[in-house]
Amino acid sequence: MELAEIRNELEKTAQQIKDFRGSLDLDSMEVRIAELEDQMLDPNFWNDQQAAQKVINESNGYKETYQAFHALEEEQESMEISLELLKEEADEDLQEELEKDIKAYMATISEFELKLMLSDPYDKNNAILELHPGAGGTESQDWGSMLLRMYQRWSEKKGFKVEMLDYQAGDEAGIKSVTLLIKGHNAYGYLKAEKGVHRLVRISPFDSSGRRHTSFVSVDVMPELDDDIEIEVRTEDLKIDTYRATGAGGQHINTTDSAVRMTHIPSGIVVTCQSERSQLKNREQAMKMLKTKLYQKEQEEKERELAEIRGEQKEIGWGSQIRSYVFHPYSMVKDHRTNYETGNIQAVMDGDLDEFINAYLRSRIG
């Protein structure tokens, strides 16, 4: 690596450090750390152990980020000093050492950026992903099955395990709805980027006139919540139906009514589960999904209230169109939130989603 290349790399990393500093609000972080430390000094701090542990976890999280950022700043400064020394006098050993340090430093920056991108409370959790085709019958239902395959392929590439919790086949092709449980570290953190409406433009294989069609599928993503999340569900608020589980193609895969449809009457939320042969296990999974949806609804209502207080006209929920997949008259996939796009539509449909997901997550750091 020539000195000019080393200088260019250090200029790039310096800009990244500057961007991190701009997005982290270190002054507010220092104030919050001090507040939390004051709470920990209170003689009654351990009276509520659960609350105390939350304070400790929050404090540790802020401290870890704060210290990691300052370590990056110090390393940047140290390497810039080494570069100045090399400009004054050539030193092969020092230059070789600096090249190694820069490579290691860039990897550390990437790790730090990933931690910033996946720092929300439930990012580490498994994800529940639902696909719901919009109006348009067979065309949109087929688009749903294409997205199902895309997410299955993406999950395989990440080494995540996929469980089909519910599958409702389309009338002629595709799906009416699908619910997946995607298991893996940070599955929700990544897949929350996919929440929204996905739009397809193509020449329909179901239209004998060969006309161009536009189809929509909504993707909903929720974290699978731990059992320690307290959500009260009263028995009298539930309507539970059972039916025979069906697989792809509509065939019955069980001879007993093991599939469960659970309706929460006050909220109107409906969940279904047919992944297990046992009705009892399907009930347990359906209840878990229901609690997750009720928790999500509660959080979204809080966000709406905050948005109203701030005067924000921000739409909360899955109703907004986030990405377009155009097969005709040209090939392009474009994310409307980040403007990231690619012409390699086949790679995307084969599960190459990381660039779209990372672009979205990076946009949220600031």
From Swiss-Prot:
Highest taxon above the source species: Bacteria
GO cellular component labels: cytoplasm
Keywords, in A-Z order: Cytoplasm, Methylation, Protein biosynthesis
InterPro entries the UniProt entry points to: PCRF (IPR005139), Pep_chain_release_fac_I (IPR000352), Pep_chain_release_fac_I_sf (IPR045853), PrfB (IPR004374)
Listed GO biological process terms: viral translational frameshifting
Keyword set includes Protein biosynthesis: yes
Disulfide bonds: none
Main location: cytoplasm
Subcellular location: Cytoplasm
Post-translational events: Methylated by PrmC. Methylation increases the termination efficiency of RF2.
Modified sites of kind N5-methylglutamine: Q251
Pfam families xref list: PCRF, RF-1
GO MF, one example: translation release factor activity, codon specific
UniProt cross-references to HAMAP family, sorted A to Z: Rel_fac_2
Function: Peptide chain release factor 2 directs the termination of translation in response to the peptide chain termination codons UGA and UAA.
Family stated for the protein in its record: Belongs to the prokaryotic/mitochondrial release factor family.
Note: The gene for this protein contains a UGA in-frame termination codon after Leu-24; a naturally occurring frameshift enables complete translation of RF-2. This provides a mechanism for the protein to regulate its own production.
Protein name, UniProt field: Peptide chain release factor 2
